[in-house]
């Protein structure tokens, strides 16, 4: 049985700013772009979250919720440097580290000799070391499989950890609400509820064929997760190839203005997600996806060197006009393809 730890730093960017400027600690604080430039929030500290301020929220909305919010533009080089320090701490315990972003990673400590092989104690030691050496807090989840480790890391935030032992997996899953499973958003959760599916226990007695019919490939993933199946390995050399966001609509849309408004919202979330893995926003391509009311879908991409909202809007409108054919649209998505690391290094060499 594997021993997987998911480590998630607590409001990482904001925590670094509070560490470096203690006067910021007890006031609502967010990192993001300015409201007059249609900026978006990257992260917020816990005092700001009490006012409803969240990541991927428009800065203007955040300031309406919390007029006395302190807004900082962020220091990406500092965040990247700190992330490297955190990864070095991880490497003291295992070489099997899979970074998900600057502030989040999976660790496989199955064969680690540290702490007499106790994943719980390794997680405690890692969190304590991060606090002692970097003056930052981290939360952790410990479980035999990846997705449960990620779920567990959310259960005792901030500055805590939660353990799901192999013996506890089945009971934990039976009671787990489906919206807690990564990949189950609000619309999917509602569609599941309409079928009487609220927890993993409900899915276990539901026909796999019906899940596949209703949810496609994700139906199988959902069924497997509810059975406690997640065979994904920790991939230390894994290079993220793309970043995307999409939204399944409760009701189909039929006019471009509705689609344009949705893309404006999705773009803000895409920008936040991309900054976590590629702070300079350099990319290889960006694209749009539309899924129609007959469940057919289309994707169009455009070679572009940097995330660009106007280009995405133009591409989306072209896709809408050329491929919709009067059909309703039930899903809108945006995505970027990242530069191959070898190509990116060559560009730096050629032009640096």
Swiss-Prot record:
Top class in the EC scheme: transferase
CDD domains assigned to the protein according to its UniProt record, in alphabetical order: PolY_Pol_IV_kappa
Entry GO CC: cytosol
Single Gene Ontology MF annotation: damaged DNA binding
Binding site residues for Mg(2+): 8, 103
Binding partners and assembly: Monomer.
Species of provenance: Pectobacterium atrosepticum (strain SCRI 1043 / ATCC BAA-672)
Gene name in the database record: dinB
UniProt keyword Magnesium, yes or no: yes
Location in or out of the cell: Cytoplasm
Family stated for the protein in its record: Belongs to the DNA polymerase type-Y family.
Protein name, UniProt field: DNA polymerase IV
Claim: DNA damage is one of the keywords in the record: yes
Function, as annotated: Poorly processive, error-prone DNA polymerase involved in untargeted mutagenesis. Copies undamaged DNA at stalled replication forks, which arise in vivo from mismatched or misaligned primer ends. These misaligned primers can be extended by PolIV. Exhibits no 3'-5' exonuclease (proofreading) activity. May be involved in translesional synthesis, in conjunction with the beta clamp from PolIII.
Cofactor(s) annotated in UniProt: Mg(2+)
Reactions accelerated catalytically: DNA(n) + a 2'-deoxyribonucleoside 5'-triphosphate = DNA(n+1) + diphosphate
């Amino acid at each position: 049985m594997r021993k997987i730890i998911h480590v998630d730093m607590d409001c990482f960017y904001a925590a670094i700013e509070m560490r470096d400027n203690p006067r910021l600690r007890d006031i609502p604080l967010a990192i993001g772009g300015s409201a007059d430039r249609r900026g978006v929030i990257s992260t917020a500290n816990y005092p700001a979250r009490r006012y409803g301020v969240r990541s991927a929220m428009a800065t203007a909305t955040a300031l309406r919720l919390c007029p006395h919010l302190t807004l900082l533009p962020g220091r990406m080089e500092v965040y990247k440097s700190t992330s490297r320090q955190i990864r070095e701490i991880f490497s003291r315990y295992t070489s099997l580290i899979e970074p998900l972003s600057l502030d989040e990673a999976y660790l496989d400590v199955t064969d680690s000799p540290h702490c007499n092989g106790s994943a719980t104690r390794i997680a405690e030691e890692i969190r304590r070391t991060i606090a002692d050496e970097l003056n930052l807090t981290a939360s952790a989840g410990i479980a035999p499989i990846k997705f449960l480790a990620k779920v567990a890391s959310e259960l005792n935030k901030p500055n805590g950890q939660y353990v799901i032992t192999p013996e506890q997996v089945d009971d934990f899953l039976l009671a787990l609400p489906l919206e807690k499973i990564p990949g189950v958003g609000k619309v999917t959760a509602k569609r599941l509820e309409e079928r009487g599916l609220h927890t993993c226990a409900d899915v276990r007695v539901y026909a796999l064929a019906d899940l596949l019919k209703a949810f496609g490939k994700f139906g199988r993933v959902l069924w497997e997760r509810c059975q406690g199946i997640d065979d994904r390995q920790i991939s230390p050399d894994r290079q993220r190839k793309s970043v995307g966001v999409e939204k399944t609509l409760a009701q189909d849309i039929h006019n471009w203005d509705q689609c344009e408004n949705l893309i404006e919202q999705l773009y803000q979330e895409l920008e936040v997600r991309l900054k976590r893995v590629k702070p300079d926003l350099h990319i290889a391509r960006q694209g749009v996806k539309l899924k129609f009311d007959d469940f057919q879908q289309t994707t169009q991409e455009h070679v572009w060197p940097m995330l660009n909202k106007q280009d995405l809007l133009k591409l989306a409108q072209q896709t809408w006009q050329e491929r919709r054919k009067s059909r309703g649209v039930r899903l809108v998505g945006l995505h970027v393809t990242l530069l191959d690391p070898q190509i990116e290094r060559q560009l730096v060499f050629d032009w640096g």
